[in-house]
């Protein structure tokens, strides 16, 4: 089966978010045909949009996933799996930028550049978010330090399609805007124990 390298962002700020991300990574690795290839450091990050909520924990994973017969089919299949996992972890429809039990975002899917309609089982769980398109690379990733910092841990030299620059360049640019205190690495992934090791 042909595979493609995908990058998925994870975030949570309800309950024990670090433990939730550990369980989320295990669930991603257990998806059919998926191989876990890398896990970023764990970051403590300030909320975006709605400030009156707990800080988030964010990470990014590198996955080899089934490519599908074409990039659109492969990306949609992964999206549907991600949304299914969100629901399995208790994610409910909430306001956009609000608290999350578990948030899984498809950031990059190989060299694909897509803007396709989401199937019903792949729609966003953000209340009031009218966008029904799956956009790959993720349309907001280049402007979110909480995505760029962990993504740069895994693929600093990656230039996602349409960006015109590398992940590390985008990370440094956003850090200059948001300040280095906006995201803080707090743990590394221990592949042997499949858990975070505090820094």
Model-assigned labels for residue ranges:
Residues 1-8, 14-101, 109-112:
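Nucleotide and nucleotide-moiety/phosphate-recognizing core
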Residues 48-56, 76-199:
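Flexible, gly/pro- and Lys/Arg-enriched active-site loops
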């Amino acid at each position: 089966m042909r595979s493609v390298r995908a990058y998925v962002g994870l975030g949570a700020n309800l309950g024990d978010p670090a433990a939730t991300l550990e369980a989320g990574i295990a669930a991603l690795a257990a998806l059919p045909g998926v191989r876990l290839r890398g896990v970023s450091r764990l970051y403590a990050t300030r909320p975006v949009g709605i400030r009156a909520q707990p800080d988030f924990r964010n990470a990014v994973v590198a996955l080899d996933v089934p490519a599908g017969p074409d990039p659109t089919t492969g990306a949609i299949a992964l999206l549907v799996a991600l949304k299914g996992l969100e629901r399995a972890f208790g994610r409910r429809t909430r306001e956009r930028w609000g608290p999350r039990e578990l948030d899984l975002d498809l950031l990059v899917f190989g060299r694909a550049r897509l803007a396709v309609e989401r199937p019903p089982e792949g729609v966003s769980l953000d209340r009031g978010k009218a966008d029904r398109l799956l956009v790959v690379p993720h349309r907001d990733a280049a402007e979110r330090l909480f995505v760029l910092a962990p993504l740069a841990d895994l693929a600093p030299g990656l230039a996602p399609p349409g960006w015109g620059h590398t992940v590390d360049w985008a990370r440094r640019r956003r850090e200059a805007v948001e300040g280095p205190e906006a995201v803080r690495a707090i743990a590394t992934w221990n592949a042997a124990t499949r858990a975070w090791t505090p820094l």
